[in-house]
Amino acid sequence: MKDRIVRATAANGGIRLVAVLTTESSLEAKKRHGLSYLATCILGRAFSASLLLASSMKIMHGRVTLRVRSDGPLKGLLVDAGRDGKVRGYVGNPDLELDLVKIASNKYSFDFKNALGTGYLNVIRDSGIGEPFTSTVELVNGNIAEDLASYLYHSEQTPSAVFIGEKIENKGVICSGGLLAQVLPKKDTDPLLVSLLEERCKEINSFSEDLFQSKDNLLSLIRNIFPDIDDKSISEKARSQEVSFKCKCSKKRSLNAMKMLDKSELEDILKKDGEAELVCEFCKNKYLINYEEIKSIIEN
């Protein structure tokens, strides 16, 4: 099934719910960047986190940029996601693999904490109107979900719960996604709603397992956690909004990037190579700028 996002409310409109599936987007990123399993999981989690944040934006062309700057061997990451469901991103060290860490009897997990190390999560919300809103928080433990929850608590001061996970088998990632539950701003002083949110979240023992068992049915996933979901809040449009790995790069953007170079630099490229190849960091697409195109930039 294609990746998608579903929005709903519970408790008579007091709690906002968003669930996202990012399996195919994560696999596409793995293929394009040659990611290890560990890097695939971390980038997939960042995809889910950024899409969950972007889902609350009022304007369809609104975007969220999520950047991690840290001292871990992953060497950080950058993700760009839109309210339209388009997401792209990359990590600093795509080949990184670390030993699994034991989290319980016969249960192991990827070492997200050591992969990212200590550092900061930077979130930029850009609605396309006025200046983008930027906020930075320290990384909590590198599993992305708790890092995002920390951002929501400190920057938006909204009672929130964030769950992000994935299921891995020998053949690779078989599911990846996330869930965001928030008490809506006008209701955030209601102790009963905050208590309800806490109670529902305590019932989640393993979000990754719940995601897998839902078999890509996000409505089923939400209902299992919030049985008091408001069915009227789920529109057909919300049910069917697709999510996909999609980059904004193009030959035109590459030519514009070349125009930023000094005339002497362009002349040096013509003299040494006769052409230039630009590679997009987000998707690894390659764009060849030939001799005539570079010459035209110099002359104009």
Swiss-Prot record:
This protein's superkingdom? Bacteria
Pfam annotation, one family = HSP33
Keywords of the record: Chaperone, Cytoplasm, Disulfide bond, Redox-active center, Zinc
Gene3D superfamilies in the record:
Hsp33 domain, HSP33 redox switch-like
Concerning PTM, the database record says:
Under oxidizing conditions two disulfide bonds are formed involving the reactive cysteines. Under reducing conditions zinc is bound to the reactive cysteines and the protein is inactive.
UniProt keyword Acetylation, yes or no: no
Q: Which GO terms describe its cellular component?
A: cytoplasm
Its function, per the record, reads:
Redox regulated molecular chaperone. Protects both thermally unfolding and oxidatively damaged proteins from irreversible aggregation. Plays an important role in the bacterial defense system toward oxidative stress.
Cellular location(s) = Cytoplasm
InterPro entries membership: Heat_shock_Hsp33, Heat_shock_Hsp33_C, Heat_shock_Hsp33_N
Matches recorded under PANTHER family: 33 KDA CHAPERONIN
A single Gene Ontology molecular function, please? protein folding chaperone
Q: What is the protein's given name?
A: 33 kDa chaperonin
Cystine residue pairs: C247-C249, C280-C283
